[in-house]
């Protein structure tokens, strides 16, 4: 039995088109430096992020492929006490997973559209990215772990 050419073409075209659409839907529009940041972050022993508790809750991965293990503690002493901030401490490999989650939510493909936490994820990604770019190798064992502060009520220094 011979299959008409149009039917054969249709059988080949539809699955190919479906695979293409599914591939595009899963894409993000990552910044050009994203892969370099992931590589650099992977080499960090530990990093701390100080941010509002709600911002962490909104952007932390909640299962799926980008699971993040982090220690979260309330900032209760020092000049940033009583501001609703938390210190999120994680290893470099967990920072990689967090950055992947942030990138996926902050830079969705035009096919996916924005997610409910796109703005929050973009804010965190945009704060973490330049800090990772600035990290230099430790010069002594006493050098502190990198600390990234996300609190827009504190004026930037520099």
Q: Where in the sequence are the language-model features?
A:
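Positively charged, low-complexity terminal tracts
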Residues: 2-158
């Amino acid at each position: 039995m011979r299959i008409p050419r149009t039917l054969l073409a249709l059988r080949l075209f539809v699955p190919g088109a479906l695979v293409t659409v599914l591939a595009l839907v899963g894409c993000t529009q990552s910044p050009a430096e994203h892969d370099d940041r992931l590589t650099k972050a992977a080499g960090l022993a530990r990093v701390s992020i100080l941010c509002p508790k709600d911002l962490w809750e909104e952007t932390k991965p909640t299962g799926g492929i980008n699971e993040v293990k982090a220690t979260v503690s309330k900032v209760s002493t020092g000049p940033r006490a009583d501001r609703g901030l938390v210190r999120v401490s994680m290893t470099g490999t967990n920072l990689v997973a967090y950055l992947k989650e942030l990138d996926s939510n902050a830079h969705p493909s035009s096919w996916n559209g924005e997610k409910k936490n796109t703005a929050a994820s973009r804010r965190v990604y945009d704060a973490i990215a330049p800090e990772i770019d600035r990290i230099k190798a430790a010069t002594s064992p006493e050098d502190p772990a990198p600390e990234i502060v996300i609190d827009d009520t504190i004026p930037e220094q520099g």
